[in-house]
C-alpha cells in the first residue's frame, strides 16, 4: 500500500513572543534594533508571535510592524492578545490568531545525563547537552554558544551565550565563575548583556528563574 502524500500530526514548538507595549513603531523599532545589535544571530530568521495585549488602539499599524520586522529578518507567524479589530487586520495579512495555551501542571522530566567538557569553547562553536546538564571546565568565549536541556555549570568565564532549560525545564540554572555573557536564557526567558550588567558585576553567580523573571545570586567561589 502506498504511503499517503500528506499527513496531519500534532506537534509542539517553542516560539519567541514579542510583546508590543507602544503604538509608536519608531520607538519600538529603535529599542528592538538595540537588542538585535547585541545578539543578532540569536534572533536571525526567528519566527515570532506578537503579543498585542497592551495595544488598545484599533488603528495600530500591524502591516507596518510586519514589514519592519521582515526587514530585520524576523518573521511574524501570528498574534495573540489582540482586540477584535486588530485580529481581523491580522487575518487580512495572513497571520494566525494564537491563543495562549494552558499552563501544564506536569513538570518536564528531569535531565537524565550530564555532558562534561574540559576545554574552552571558542567563538563560532556550539555545544548542546540534550536531555541533560552541561559542565564545562573552561571558558566560553565571545560568539560561542552553550545549550542544555538541563542546567549549565561553567568553571571559568562565560562571555558568549548560554541557554539552559532549552526543552522547557524552568528549574534549570546557569552557574559561572565570571558572568560576562552576551545572552543568557532559561526555559525561553532571556537576558541580553545590558540586562545582565544591571544585575551582576562580572563576578561568580547563579542565574535562575523566579516565577517568569530571571534573577542572579552571588556565589562564594
From Swiss-Prot:
Alphabetized, the UniProt keywords read:
Cell cycle, Cell division, Septation
User: One biological-process term from Gene Ontology?
Assistant: division septum assembly
Q: Does the keyword Plastid apply?
A: no
State the InterPro entries in the record: CAP/MinC_C (IPR016098), MinC (IPR013033), MinC_C_sf (IPR036145), MinC_N (IPR007874), Septum_form_inhib_MinC_C (IPR005526)
What role is this protein assigned? Cell division inhibitor that blocks the formation of polar Z ring septums. Rapidly oscillates between the poles of the cell to destabilize FtsZ filaments that have formed before they mature into polar Z rings. Prevents FtsZ polymerization.
The record's similarity note reads: Belongs to the MinC family.
State the oligomer form and interacting partners: Interacts with MinD and FtsZ.
What name does this protein carry? Answer: Probable septum site-determining protein MinC
